Structure formats: structure tokens, C-alpha cells
Amino acid sequence: MATKDLTFEQAMEKLEGIVSKLEEGDVPLEKAIEYYQEGMNLSKLCSEKLNHVQDKMVQIMNEQGELEPFDIQEDSSS
């Protein structure tokens, strides 16, 4: 499965595995660089997925079932 096809959870699981391997400290330099590059790609993917979800969360369905911006403002008259 290509990295871009991973779910957020799958990407995080792979990223956690890479971090664990690198923290062990007995990884050859070349392999550590490969892990680092893969980890950075996974980190970017997770960040993009979170940003996408955040964008969706700031919208709310109106009565016609259309998405509209969701604006949380406290009522100052209460």
C-alpha cells in the first residue's frame, strides 16, 4: 500500500514503529536515514489529514443540508 493510501491511524502506527526503531539506537546510519525520510513523509501525511479534518469540522450543515461555515460566538447579552 502506498503511503498516500494509508489511513491516519495506519500512518501513525507506522510512524510510531519508526520512532521506536530509531530510539533503540542500533540502526545502521543508512537505514536510519531511510527511516527518517519515511517518518517525515508519514508525518506530513498525518498533518495533511488532520488539516483536512479540521477544515471539515469548521463547517456545519444548514437546514437545506448544505455545508456552511461554523462560527462559534458567545452571546454577549446573557
UniProtKB/Swiss-Prot annotation:
InterPro entries: Exonuc_VII_S, Exonuc_VII_ssu_sf
GO molecular function, one term: exodeoxyribonuclease VII activity
Short name of any one Pfam family annotated for the protein: Exonuc_VII_S
Keyword Methyltransferase: no
Segments crossing the lipid bilayer: none
Keywords carried by this UniProt record: Cytoplasm, Exonuclease, Hydrolase, Nuclease
Subcellular location: Cytoplasm
Keyword Transferase on entry: no
Any one cellular-component term (Gene Ontology): exodeoxyribonuclease VII complex
SUPFAM superfamilies: XseB-like
GO biological process, one term: DNA catabolic process
Family: Belongs to the XseB family.
NCBIfam families, sorted: PRK14063.1, xseB
Function: Bidirectionally degrades single-stranded DNA into large acid-insoluble oligonucleotides, which are then degraded further into small acid-soluble oligonucleotides.
Assembly: Heterooligomer composed of large and small subunits.
Protein name in UniProt: Exodeoxyribonuclease 7 small subunit
Species in which this protein is naturally found: Oceanobacillus iheyensis (strain DSM 14371 / CIP 107618 / JCM 11309 / KCTC 3954 / HTE831)
Gene from which this protein is expressed: xseB
